[in-house]
Amino acid sequence: MKQRTLSIIKPDALKKKVVGKIIDRFESNGLEVIAMKRLHLSVKDAENFYAIHRERPFFKDLIEFMVSGPVVVMVLEGKDAVAKNRDLMGATDPKLAQKGTIRADFAESIDANAVHGSDSLENAHNEIAFFFAARDL
């Protein structure tokens, strides 16, 4: 089934200048970039986007990292986009990610792990709406 999902290329990947390589992974695996923008998240936006993690011990570090530099936010579309994106990203901890996944190839740590991807269709819908107006899609 054709779906949409949100992907964020995080500050560490932008610093390494691997944005094009990451986008190529999506496109060469059947995910089309239908909307994209580069931005610098404010603390407030990062806190609101990651509100689900507010009570977790890593929340403060996550917010600091996500506002440490620009990010690229994209809507990906394709067959089973949510699951496909998560497969392409690999495990959250790049040390556990399978060889050939985005995190295994481009991430350094569980904190600086190159990419974010929606973990469910419902969250994809909410995350896309957080960054993109319907008219932009």
UniProtKB/Swiss-Prot annotation:
It is an enzyme of class 2 (transferase). GO terms for cellular component: cytoplasm. Gene3D superfamilies: Nucleoside diphosphate kinase-like domain (3.30.70.141). It catalyses: a 2'-deoxyribonucleoside 5'-diphosphate + ATP = a 2'-deoxyribonucleoside 5'-triphosphate + ADP; a ribonucleoside 5'-diphosphate + ATP = a ribonucleoside 5'-triphosphate + ADP. SMART domains: NDK (SM00562). ATP binds at residues 10, 58, 86, 92, 103, 113. Its main location: cytoplasm. One of its GO terms (molecular function) is ATP binding. Belongs to the NDK family. Homotetramer. NCBIfam families: PRK00668.1. Major role in the synthesis of nucleoside triphosphates other than ATP. The ATP gamma phosphate is transferred to the NDP beta phosphate via a ping-pong mechanism, using a phosphorylated active-site intermediate. This is Nucleoside diphosphate kinase. The lineage of its organism: Bacteria, Pseudomonadati, Campylobacterota, Epsilonproteobacteria, Campylobacterales.
